[in-house]
């Protein structure tokens, strides 16, 4: 249990430090770090970032559109699963194109990935809309937000296609190699992309039109920090075979993070629709 306590302490400390710096700032380094952050968002990676539009709202729209696309894939996977349970021979004709349907476990896993990815895109996209509305109507870098959304989808697709790719090649220790590559693509790359998004959100918060930080902003930032930390914990926990660390990080990634994002969206939609704050003053 020591590793669990250490991981929890590190995560809580990270959340505390981020919360403290959001309120107190970082003194004279604020301007320099903002310029450096904007340079990273607008210039890195060179060439690729130029392919994306920096028009106001384009980044949040990209997140929401990808969320709808992943949700459609989840619906298709769910439909195929229900159909196969109703008629186990319904998909046998697909063997003519070289694909045979087994017990449905892989389809179930893929559908779960589709749905969790869709949920992440839709909730983060909706929260980004709320944050941008409080900061001059745009994110610090809409192009960077769009690029992160595209690269995150590409990383997820790589994870989904790797088992099929490895079925055509002969690799020693195939299972372990496949797991390592999938973990790098899903957790390490995913964490780096979410760090870029977090930097974007931080700079956007710095451009807000009032001093107060909204509950939506708090929930979004803390959710992103918790997600980044849990992804890294899962990767390094798998690397050193620390099952307790992986267990704890998965609880955070699959439980705390979606809940925080749901609260982030709710704390914007409810007051915006009702015309009054969630909690009375």
Per-segment meaning from a language model:
Residues 176-183:
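Hydrophobic, ordered structural segments
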Residues 54-55, 62, 211, 218:
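Generic detector of short alpha-helix boundary/capping microenvironments
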Residues 45-60:
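Cytosolic juxtamembrane amphipathic/interface segments immediately preceding
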Residues 2-45, 61-89, 96-170, 183-205, ...:
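Hydrophobic cores of alpha-helical transmembrane segments in multi-pass integral membrane proteins
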Residues 171-175, 240-244:
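Membrane-interface helix termini and inter-helical loops of multi-pass transporters
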Residues 210-214, 245, 273-281:
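Hydrophobic, small-residue-rich membrane helices and short re-entrant helix-turn-helix hairpins
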């Amino acid at each position: 249990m020591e590793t669990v306590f250490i991981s929890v302490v590190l995560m809580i400390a990270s959340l505390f430090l981020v919360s403290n710096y959001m309120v107190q700032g970082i003194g004279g380094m604020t301007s320099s770090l903002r310029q450096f952050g904007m340079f990273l968002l607008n210039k890195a990676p060179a060439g690729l970032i130029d392919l994306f539009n920096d028009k106001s709202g384009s980044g949040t729209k990209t997140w929401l559109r990808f969320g709808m696309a992943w949700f459609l894939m989840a619906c298709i996977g769910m439909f195929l699963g229900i159909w196969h349970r109703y008629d186990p021979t319904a998909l046998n004709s697909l063997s003519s194109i070289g694909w045979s349907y087994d017990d449905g476990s892989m389809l179930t896993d893929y559908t779960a990935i589709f749905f969790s990815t869709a949920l992440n895109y839709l909730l983060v996209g909706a929260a980004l809309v709320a944050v941008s509305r409080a900061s001059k109507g745009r994110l610090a870098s809409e192009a960077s937000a769009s690029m992160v959304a595209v690269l995150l989808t590409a990383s997820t697709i790589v994870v989904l296609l790797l088992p099929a790719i490895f079925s055509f090649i002969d690799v020693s220790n195939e299972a372990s190699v496949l797991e390592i590559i999938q973990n790098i693509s899903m957790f390490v790359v995913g964490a780096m992309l979410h760090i870029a998004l977090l930097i974007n959100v931080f700079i956007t918060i710095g451009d807000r039109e009032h001093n107060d930080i909204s509950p939506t902003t708090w929930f979004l930032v803390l959710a992103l920090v918790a997600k980044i930390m849990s992804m890294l914990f899962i990767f390094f926990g798998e690397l050193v075979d620390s099952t307790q660390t992986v267990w704890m990080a998965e609880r955070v990634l699959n439980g705390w993070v979606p809940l925080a994002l749901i609260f982030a969206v709710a704390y914007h939609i409810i007051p915006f629709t009702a015309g009054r704050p969630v909690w009375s003053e």
